[in-house]
A protein has these predicted regions:
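Conserved phosphate/anionic-ligand binding catalytic regions in large, soluble enzymes, centered on
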Residues: 1, 93-112, 135-157
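Interdomain helical connector at the RecA1-RecA2 junction of SF1/SF2 helicase-like NTPases
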Residues: 1-27
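Generic beta-strand/beta-sheet core signal
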Residues: 10, 53-55, 70, 77, ...
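Conserved nucleotide-binding/hydrolysis micro-motifs of P-loop NTPases
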Residues: 13-17, 56-59, 81-83, 104-108, ...
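Conserved interdomain hinge at the start of the Helicase C-terminal
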Residues: 20-51
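Flexible beta-alpha connector loops of hexameric P-loop NTPases
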Residues: 20-32, 74-83, 126
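Conserved motor-coupling elements within RecA-like helicase/translocase cores
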Residues: 45-46, 57-122
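C-terminal helicase module of SF1/SF2 nucleic-acid helicases/translocases
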Residues: 117-189
Length: 189
């Protein structure tokens, strides 16, 4: 009970169809950033729209430069482009569309799927935010598979992010395992 009140779970209006992949851990934010274009390209090749969630405007701009270098068309939704928000969100669910967004695409942002996208698996969300709050992770992931549509999401963490610096023994173990091989570690959810 919160504030002395009972809590009631409100069921979904339609069954949830989101597929959540196991989280991936990367040695550094740099290694993670280098891996994003290949993942995005693979999803776009399937005809799926992709939303990549990042923490800051600077990260959005850096990722935009990486995607440009890889020849991947995309839109950026951040505080610098807030006047275009409605147009970017309206296009974000179209087949093969890539959107890079800061937390502006969080709670309350409903990305509608374009023609044929549901049959291809729906919107895929790649959450590359290292949030101290699980609520913010859920908001990012929650952009996929809304209103009974199919969709998928995955969370990619960078072990050099500030949230991991005070994590104790479990983070220390992950760091030691990460040193055994470069790049990403897949860990069970």
């Amino acid at each position: 009970a919160v504030y002395g009140r009972q809590i009631v779970a409100v069921p979904l209006r339609r069954p949830g169809l989101r597929q959540l992949a196991p989280p991936r851990l990367f040695a550094t934010g740099q290694v993670r950033a280098e891996a994003i274009p290949a993942r995005v390209q693979a999803l776009v090749a399937q005809g799926r729209p992709v939303l990549v969630g990042v923490d800051t405007v600077a990260e959005a701009q850096a990722l935009s430069a990486r995607l440009n270098a890889a020849g991947i068309d995309h839109q950026v939704l951040d505080a610098r482009h807030d006047a275009d928000e409605a147009a970017v969100v309206a296009m974000a669910g179209q087949a093969g569309t890539v959107t890079v967004a800061t937390r502006m695409a969080g709670r309350g942002t409903d990305i509608e799927l374009g023609a044929g996208v549901a049959e291809r698996g729906g919107l895929h969300v790649l959450c590359c935010q290292d949030n101290a709050s699980a609520r913010l992770d859920r908001q990012c992931i929650g952009r996929a598979a809304r209103q009974g549509d199919p969709g998928s999401a995955e969370v990619w963490h960078a072990l050099d992010a500030s949230i991991w610096q005070s994590g104790g023994a479990s983070v220390g173990l992950l760091r030691r395992r990460q040193q055994e091989g470069p790049g990403a570690l897949a860990v069970p959810a």
